[in-house]
Amino acid sequence: MKLLSKTFLILTLTFFFFGIALAKQSFEPEIEALKSFKNGISNDPLGVLSDWTIIGSLRHCNWTGITCDSTGHVVSVSLLEKQLEGVLSPAIANLTYLQVLDLTSNSFTGKIPAEIGKLTELNQLILYLNYFSGSIPSGIWELKNIFYLDLRNNLLSGDVPEEICKTSSLVLIGFDYNNLTGKIPECLGDLVHLQMFVAAGNHLTGSIPVSIGTLANLTDLDLSGNQLTGKIPRDFGNLLNLQSLVLTENLLEGDIPAEIGNCSSLVQLELYDNQLTGKIPAELGNLVQLQALRIYKNKLTSSIPSSLFRLTQLTHLGLSENHLVGPISEEIGFLESLEVLTLHSNNFTGEFPQSITNLRNLTVLTVGFNNISGELPADLGLLTNLRNLSAHDNLLTGPIPSSISNCTGLKLLDLSHNQMTGEIPRGFGRMNLTFISIGRNHFTGEIPDDIFNCSNLETLSVADNNLTGTLKPLIGKLQKLRILQVSYNSLTGPIPREIGNLKDLNILYLHSNGFTGRIPREMSNLTLLQGLRMYSNDLEGPIPEEMFDMKLLSVLDLSNNKFSGQIPALFSKLESLTYLSLQGNKFNGSIPASLKSLSLLNTFDISDNLLTGTIPGELLASLKNMQLYLNFSNNLLTGTIPKELGKLEMVQEIDLSNNLFSGSIPRSLQACKNVFTLDFSQNNLSGHIPDEVFQGMDMIISLNLSRNSFSGEIPQSFGNMTHLVSLDLSSNNLTGEIPESLANLSTLKHLKLASNNLKGHVPESGVFKNINASDLMGNTDLCGSKKPLKPCTIKQKSSHFSKRTRVILIILGSAAALLLVLLLVLILTCCKKKEKKIENSSESSLPDLDSALKLKRFEPKELEQATDSFNSANIIGSSSLSTVYKGQLEDGTVIAVKVLNLKEFSAESDKWFYTEAKTLSQLKHRNLVKILGFAWESGKTKALVLPFMENGNLEDTIHGSAAPIGSLLEKIDLCVHIASGIDYLHSGYGFPIVHCDLKPANILLDSDRVAHVSDFGTARILGFREDGSTTASTSAFEGTIGYLAPEFAYMRKVTTKADVFSFGIIMMELMTKQRPTSLNDEDSQDMTLRQLVEKSIGNGRKGMVRVLDMELGDSIVSLKQEEAIEDFLKLCLFCTSSRPEDRPDMNEILTHLMKLRGKANSFREDRNEDREV
């Protein structure tokens, strides 16, 4: 019995230990696979794998992150957010029972092992947020059980293969934020169980597969941040379970399919940052569950459909950066769940919706860059959750509502670039503001004290208002301030020394005020300051030494103050400077050579001072990287121009004019191949103008070497300057002939050669065709066909006739003279008879007129038919002298018919009509309205036929509904057109033709908005002459009040200077959008437009900018633009001088405009550098 028991025990133990050994052997591959996984980990900072050690049996199932089934096989490896670093071992394939592999948010690198395709039981592969690279292993697509594939946020590359469509079990696919390329497979629609497909942030191309529209179970689709093209498939309207559709930041085009309105489950619709066009579909109003609709940054047109205001679940509505139009409906107040509303950068008009205050959950409201008018709601303070209110760049008026102080959570307030008035309300200190920008308005009064209680404020811009008072010492409390802009106001007093407390300040703009005194030494505490503009104040004294401790300073503008003394050598410490302007002060002494350390300068202006001595060569050599502007003009500098100037190979503008430089132009200057403008005028330079210097300067627009002592011939290389617009060589000692090559420069509009010793023939083509005689005077040996030049004669050998021959010639000459007398008597007799006949029937002379004019003579009936019997509906302009009708000839030609008012014309003016019609038909210039023909019937009709101008007249463009001419360059271009036409009238014909009624209504714009001067013959047809005489029987022709020159209104004297006056008024009107009469100043005193402009310039740049039209004023972003506009307005005042002899001629005006155009065309400063925030 004992033996039996002992045997049984031995057998039991034997089977037990055999079972253990067998179990250990069956799990060994999985354990080894896990060990290999652990060996692939190079860093385990949290020690999560420290328990991966064999102790006893089956212990691997208890390791961190491991889950086994009931038989002990590993079915899940889940190691989320464990900070593991390393590679994924291919041995993972030996976990043959593995169903879930989740390595979310670690730092695995290398490729995903191809062996992973052997895990036939795998249904979830989650490798989200790692650094896996390479392509997606093809074996994954053989995993028949996988339904959850998440590879987001890795570095995977390659295409999405067609094989993905074989894995029909997939429910979720996540490819977000990798480097995948190629097209989305068209067969994606075969994955019938797919609920989520997200592939944002890759480089996918091609169109969106239409087959996606068949995925009935799809709830989430995100393809944002790729380069997808084509249209949004209309089949998406079949996705009734779709909850989130995100296609943002692609290149999609076409319209938003109305069919999306069928996706009744949609909660989120994001289509922003594409190139979508067309209307916002009204059908989107059917998406009653929609919470987020963001379709901003597209090219959508139309108004906001009223159906959108039914989406009461909306929390986010983003329609900004489109081309949407119309008013913002008061129905916006129905969207009471709205938290974020962005409508900025559209073309919305109408008044600010008062119902906006119903949106009590609103945190962000942006409506900037529109044309919204009206006032902000008085109860704006009801929006107590508001954090961001941005309504800049609109047409808002009225005050800032005082209730805004109830918006205690408000952090950002931007109301800049509007027309708001009143004082800045108190209560700002109650809010949590970090950003305040209310510049470019009409706010008055002082900066309220409690604004200085905004202790978190980082940006404060109150620039370009009518603020008065001082900048108070309380400013020192805003110690988090980074940007402070108070420029373009009327602040006075000293700059407070407490400003030195603002140690985080990056930008400080104090310019264009009335600050006085010295720069406070405490400003040296602003060691983080990068931009400092204090120009156009009344600051004085020397620059304090402490200021040069601001080592990060990049922009420094101290121009137009009263600083004196020498330019401190300590400027050399400001090695980060890229922009330095000391222009318009009282600095004296020499230019410090130590400034050579300022090697990063792009703009350097020390003009208009009292500087003496020479330019240090080493300074110029250090500026070799300068790209924009070097100006040392209007000083007392001497010596030669340093050869080192040639080191500035990238500079665009050099001005050394009005100094005392001597010697010759350095040959090294030829290296400055990028220069646009070069001015060495008004110096003592001499020698030949070196031909080789200018051979490579083919970018130059303006070259001025006038008022020097240059000798020799004009270089032939000037003829190679294919962009040259203005060339001034006047007042030198140049000799030789004028190069014919100058006549071939099509761009050359202004050429001055006066006061030299030039000789020979003056070319007759190109710029010489319309050159002013005054620009050639002082060259006694020049000849040509243009008056008052003497004609070029060819000397011939003397002829010697015999005595007999001379007698014969005398007899023949006498006989010829007798015949000529008889012929003249006969002609006079015929003329008297003809004159008598004309009295009975004046029409008898018209055939001769037809012949003389070489114009088509229209029958009055033709014009009646073309204008529908001169229907009043076709009137496009009228005055006391004429009415202009739009008409259409039988051949389809659209014309303008100018019918003269016979009551205002004497009978004697008939003969002037013939004479002047003949004269006017011979005028040919691209900026004059061409005369196509005429119609005449004694006592009934007197009309001119003109081409029809598609864009109307300048009057409508400035004051009417026509598209405005906004930019400075566009305005200058228009003035150049007008001036060119008038200059041709004044000096391009055999005798001057005075317009006498120049005004915006008489300037027409063609389809390309090129200006054409019209009505330039009316005065002559009436019989007015330059001497003031007239044959008109009435005083009908009295010009237009406001544009009429004083001497014409009172003396009836007609000269070209009368047109110059009118042109000056037109230029002012174009810049200000103010009519020339019925203006009032701030004291309600009557004033003219000229007085308004003159007063504005007298008030400094702040006043000047304020008088400009808003669009132009808002476009000013740099000091150079301000200076160009100031020059333009000064030219206007010059043109409108009360004495005619003080006004320039039209050629001089054209020259000045071309120079201004060159400046306006070459502005290169960054738009944000001088723009008020």
Swiss-Prot record:
Residues 1-23 form the signal peptide. It catalyses: L-seryl-[protein] + ATP = O-phospho-L-seryl-[protein] + ADP + H(+); L-threonyl-[protein] + ATP = O-phospho-L-threonyl-[protein] + ADP + H(+). Residues 24-806 are extracellular. Changing residue 867 to V: Abolishes flagellin-dependent signaling and reduces ligand-receptor internalization. The keyword Nucleotidyltransferase does not apply. Residues 828-1173 are cytoplasmic. Disruption phenotype: Impaired BIK1 pathogen-associated molecular patterns (PAMPs e.g. flg22)-induced ubiquitination. Residues 870-1155 form the Protein kinase domain. ATP binds at residues 876-884, 898. LRR repeats lie at residues 97-119, 121-143, 145-167, 169-192, 193-215, 217-240, 241-263, 265-288, 289-311, 313-335, 337-359, 361-383, 385-407, 409-431, 432-454, 456-478, 480-503, 504-527, 528-550, 552-574, 576-599, 600-621, 627-649, 650-673, 674-696, 699-721, 723-746, 747-769. Changing residue 318 to R: In fls2-24; abolishes flagellin-binding. Autophosphorylated. The phosphorylated form is essential in the perception of flagellin. Dephosphorylated by KAPP. Autophosphorylation is inhibited by the binding with avrPto1. Polyubiquitinated at the kinase domain mediated by P.syringae AvrPtoB. The chain crosses the membrane at residues 807-827. GO terms for cellular component: endomembrane system; endosome; endosome membrane; membrane; plasma membrane. Its main location: membrane. Changing residue 316 to A: Abolishes flagellin-binding. Its EC number is 2.7.11.1. Heterodimer with SERK3/BAK1. The activation by flagellin (flg22) induces the dissociation of the complex with SERK3/BAK1. Interacts with KAPP. Does not form homodimer. Interacts with SERK3/BAK1, SERK4/BKK1, SERK1 and SERK2 in a specific ligand-induced manner. Interacts with P.syringae AvrPto1, AvrPtoB and (via the kinase and cytoplasmic domains) hopD2. Component of large complexes containing, at least, FLS2 and ACD6 in endoplasmic reticulum and plasma membrane. Interacts with MORC1/CRT1. Interacts with PBS1, BIK1, PBL1 and PBL2. Interacts with RBOHD. This is LRR receptor-like serine/threonine-protein kinase FLS2. The lineage of its organism: Eukaryota, Viridiplantae, Streptophyta, Embryophyta, Tracheophyta.
